[in-house]
Amino acid sequence: MLNVQRGLHTTVRLSARTKYTKPKPKPQARVIKSEPSQVTHHDNNLKIRAPIPPSAKNIVCPEDHPLWQFFADKKFLRDRADLDNHSRPWTIPELRRKSFEDLHSLWYTSLKERNILARENHLLKTAVESSDDSFEKVADKVRTTMWRIRHVLSERDWSYRIANEAFVEEVDSFVQEFEKDFLLLSQDEDEEAFEQLSRFQKSIFGISEFIDENVVNKRFIDGMKLIANLKVKKFSERNNDIKTFLDQTPNNKITDAGEAFLVFTCENTEKDVKEACEAVLELRNNGNAVSRYDELDTVAEYVNRLAQAQSQATQPVSEQSS
């Protein structure tokens, strides 16, 4: 019979590691021989130099720089002898004789001079620490001119408002009187008649001869209809077709904004007015009419289209092709 003794198995202990694994050596750095995919635009041969101390000589100011407007003849500070000490402010009667363009130019010239004097006076008080008030005296004279300009403009504004309020009550009688005089002018006086009509539509309704300068509002619509009817009545006495068209129109008066626009924009000749009347008859036969609720939007669109067509017609052929 075998005598078997129980014991511990030692295979695991004998197979166990007694040291850590030796680490692998680091790989050698690879040398990239290919060119970089992107080349920098900086210079690789830059050299560090000493800083340049700030100086006025290092600053180059362009001759057309806007800040030169605050300097008189590009001087840092004018002498007292360079100031206009012998002039006087503009008087109100003198300014009343000037046009709006002249007053506008004089205002901005005075404003520019006041800005120059304010800068020089500030330098005189702070940098130089002088008590000389020569610059302030000249500035006061310029300021007097400026408030007088505003006074004259205020007078004109109030005169315009008062005259406009008074004219509202007489505008209907004035329009009737002009219509009577306009239609009485003979065919030989057509040029003078339509010059008067142009001034009339500008003064009463604010309608310009240049279509792109107009603002379409109720005043424009009313003036457009009146001018269209005057043109039709003017030539109806000379052309039977136009007279027939006028007789077929209800109350002998064009009221549709689309119809009035056709006659209003045509040339002031018998032939063109006749063609416009024929176009209006075609619109009536097709049932095309503009509702009075859509007059403003529709006429505004007509005006924009006409202005674009005129601008394209005046462009050179090379610009249109491009």
From Swiss-Prot:
InterPro entries: MRP-L47_sf, Ribosomal_uL29_mit. Residues 1-44 are annotated as: Disordered. It is found in: Mitochondrion. One of its GO terms (biological process) is mitochondrial translation. GO terms for molecular function: structural constituent of ribosome. The keyword Transit peptide applies. It comes from the Eukaryota. Component of the mitochondrial large ribosomal subunit. Mature mitochondrial ribosomes consist of a small (37S) and a large (54S) subunit. The 37S subunit contains at least 33 different proteins and 1 molecule of RNA (15S). The 54S subunit contains at least 45 different proteins and 1 molecule of RNA (21S). This is Large ribosomal subunit protein uL29m. It comes from Vanderwaltozyma polyspora (strain ATCC 22028 / DSM 70294 / BCRC 21397 / CBS 2163 / NBRC 10782 / NRRL Y-8283 / UCD 57-17). The gene is MRPL4.
